[in-house]
A protein has these predicted regions:
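Bacterial N-terminal signal peptides
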Residues: 16-29
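Conserved HGGG/HGGXW glycine-rich cap/lid loop of the alpha/beta-hydrolase fold
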Residues: 60-101, 119
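Active-site loop/oxyanion-hole signature of alpha/beta-hydrolase fold enzymes
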Residues: 90-120, 133-136, 159-163
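Short beta-strand/loop motif that positions the catalytic acidic residue
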Residues: 231-233
Length: 285
């Protein structure tokens, strides 16, 4: 004989089972959320990092903006940046468009605003032309460092200092858009003869061409008349004659050092270049 369970009992059991399942589901979900939150918190802590135990020597609170020249990009500072950072400085290496002087100046001004003052500007090669203009009347900038760089006076252009007729045949290549770059086969010997050959080949491959119209663009009022300056002469430079560099150093009344370096001094002599920049952070007011 079959026993029948009353319908009301079945309904009550159904409610109990349903409630149990819901509670179990919520419990699992809550546990998952807690674990996920804990994982997120751990990830956040890892991304923020624990306070570094490394002792820094930055007592000046001076930030640094590095400005490359033509035929290179911001990666040319890759050996200098860690030295400056390890000394406790905030560092930005810009990527110049190299389409016009105005665009390049604007790029550096944005970097100054981003990093905040006080700031030391460092220019290599054409980068010196740019910082001369970008720092003018900018109260955040406290000093200028020129590395084998152009330091023009008002009204001067790159064409005042570069004589294309004296360059080796085939040295420069101009593309259909009017952008200039160095023949990769001649890059190392003309620009970076003291750089490891393998690295020089990489530099040639990633070189950044510039709009040839930049050669004729004139400098505005120079910031080096307003600020303390430092200059590094590359004694073995084949891109800018060392005598021209010495002329610039004298013109801007710079604290000057000379290195037995190619034009690519930030790459071949990063320690000496970094030390000059660090000296500037201490000497600028």
């Amino acid at each position: 004989m079959k026993e029948y369970i009353p319908r009301t009992t079945i309904l009550r059991l159904s409610y109990v089972i349903t409630a149990f399942v819901v509670c179990l589901t919520l419990s699992i979900a809550h546990s998952g959320l807690v674990n996920a939150q804990e994982q997120n918190n751990n990830t956040l802590m890892q991304s923020q990092g624990t306070p570094s135990m490394t002792t820094t020597t930055n007592t000046t609170n001076m930030n640094i903006v590095l400005v490359h020249g033509t035929y290179v990009d911001g990666s040319s500072w890759s050996k200098v940046i860690p030295i400056l950072q390890n000394a406790g400085h905030k560092v930005i290496a810009v990527q110049l468009p190299l389409h016009s002087l105005a665009d390049d100046i604007a790029t550096v001004k944005r970097a100054i605003d981003l990093v905040g003052g006080p700031v030391i500007l460092v220019g290599h090669s054409y980068g010196g032309f740019v910082i001369t203009n970008a720092a003018y009347n900018n109260t955040s900038v406290k000093g200028l460092v020129y590395l084998a760089a152009f330091a023009p006076n008002e009204g001067q252009s790159l064409s005042n200092f570069i004589d294309a007729t004296k360059l080796p045949k085939g040295f420069l290549v101009v593309d259909n858009g009017g952008f200039v770059y160095i023949n990769p086969e001649m890059f190392a010997q003309a620009f970076a003869q003291d750089v490891d050959p393998a690295q020089a080949k990489v530099m040639a491959a990633v070189q950044k061409p510039f709009n040839q119209s930049i050669l004729a663009e004139k400098s505005g009022p120079p910031a080096w008349k307003q600020l303390p300056t430092w200059y590094q002469v590359s004694g073995n430079d084949r891109a800018i004659p060392p005598d021209v560099e010495r002329m610039f150093a004298k013109q801007i009344n710079a604290t000057t050092i000379s290195l037995a370096s190619s034009h690519a001094s930030p790459v071949s002599h990063p320690n000496e270049v970094a030390q000059l920049i660090l000296n500037a952070t201490k000497g600028a007011k």
